[in-house]
Design a protein with these regions (language model features):
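Generic detector of short alpha-helix boundary/capping microenvironments
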Residues: 8-9, 33, 48, 65, ...
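Acidic, Ser/Thr/Pro-rich low-complexity intrinsically disordered segments
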Residues: 22-23, 51-136, 142-144
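Predominantly extracellular/luminal regions of secreted and cell-surface proteins
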Residues: 21-46
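Positively charged n-region of N-terminal signal peptides that target proteins for export
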Residues: 1-5
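Generic detection of intrinsically disordered/low-complexity segments and helix-coil linkers/edges
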Residues: 13, 35, 40, 47, ...
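Bacterial N-terminal signal peptides
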Residues: 6-16
Length: 144
């Protein structure tokens, strides 16, 4: 229950992050890192969604992004971060705040989570700074 509350409390951060001012150079660098990672999934037939989410993430804070997903599709959520981030993670939660089982790629300042929902609906993607200092990040997701 505590996880559910912290997830939904972070929605404000996600909204602020999503509708921020024009991107800084570090956010552009984070987007490049995320695009490089997402490109690997494109080689497996995944198509990148238009748009991305970027902003700044601090240690022990979450960036939370609400997404609508459809059953029958497969998704990969790719995240890139800039220095001084040392390790970043990405997780997927259902609408009740329950952590879902995903495939993971962990590459230090890049991470990805793969997921195939059994039900269509709203899900939440959490980006967490595990190690390092406050950093720019970018989330891109792909589907097939």
């Amino acid at each position: 229950m505590k996880t559910s509350m912290s997830i939904f409390a972070a929605i404000g951060l996600a909204i602020t992050t999503t509708f921020a001012a024009p991107e800084s150079d570090t956010e552009v660098a984070a987007r490049k890192a995320a695009l490089d990672l997402a490109g690997a999934f494109s080689n497996e037939g995944f198509k990148m969604r238009d748009g991305h989410w970027s902003g700044t993430i601090k240690p022990k804070e979450h960036a939370l992004i609400a997404v609508n997903l459809y059953s029958g599709n497969q998704y990969w959520f790719s995240v890139g971060a800039t220095e001084p981030a040392k390790k970043i993670s990405v997780n997927v939660y259902d609408e009740t705040g329950r952590l879902l089982r995903t495939e993971h790629y962990d590459g230090g300042d890049r991470a990805a989570a793969g997921f195939s929902p059994t039900d269509s609906g709203q899900y939440f993607v959490s980006v967490d700074l595990v190690q390092g200092g406050s950093s720019s990040f970018c989330l891109i997701y792909s589907y097939k």
